[in-house]
Amino acid sequence: MNKRKEKGKSHSKRPVRNTPPRWVPFGPEEIKALIVELSKKGYGPSMIGIILRDQFGVPLVKPIVGKKLVKIMEEQGVAPPIPEDLFHLMKRAVRVRAHLAEHPKDKHSARGLMEIESKIRRLVKYYKRVGKLPPDWKYDPERARLLVQQYSALFESGA
């Protein structure tokens, strides 16, 4: 069952080839250094990928370095404390909760909040299974609000 994925199928295609392109001017060590540098500036993983693509001409990190971008960040000790997709869902849930505090009769937003929080719980279950979150980690709306306040600078479009 495809949950909430009926829209947004249009996107650019990933390069088919798994070998690094010959025209990329950077080697694996230089790309690792760029990733660490950009992470220390406050950029999140997806923003680092966009910057590497648009400003440095690196289409994909994995074929060149041999590891995914987040894996490199984890090895260097600059990875975000919680996965980026989970953080952004929690941020949306916090925003919708704040909206519902002002507009309690907004039933459409209440339903949207239920769907967002269901998706958060599914992601949490997955991240616990793969070991990215501790086994005792639980989603709590108040804790999510505090986490969003604390880590929002890490996942913004940069410092």
From Swiss-Prot:
**Amino acid composition bias (Basic residues), ranges on this chain:** 1-16
Q: Where is this region: Disordered?
A: 1-22
Q: Which GO terms describe its cellular component?
A: cytosolic small ribosomal subunit
**UniProtKB keywords:** Ribonucleoprotein, Ribosomal protein
* Origin: domain of life: Archaea
Q: Which InterPro entries match?
A: Ribosomal_uS15, Ribosomal_uS15_arc_euk, Ribosomal_uS15_N, uS15_NS1_RNA-bd_sf
UniProt KW Ribosomal protein keyword: yes
Q: Molecular function (GO) terms listed?
A: small ribosomal subunit rRNA binding; structural constituent of ribosome
Note the subunit structure.
Answer: Part of the 30S ribosomal subunit.
Q: What's the name of the protein?
A: Small ribosomal subunit protein uS15
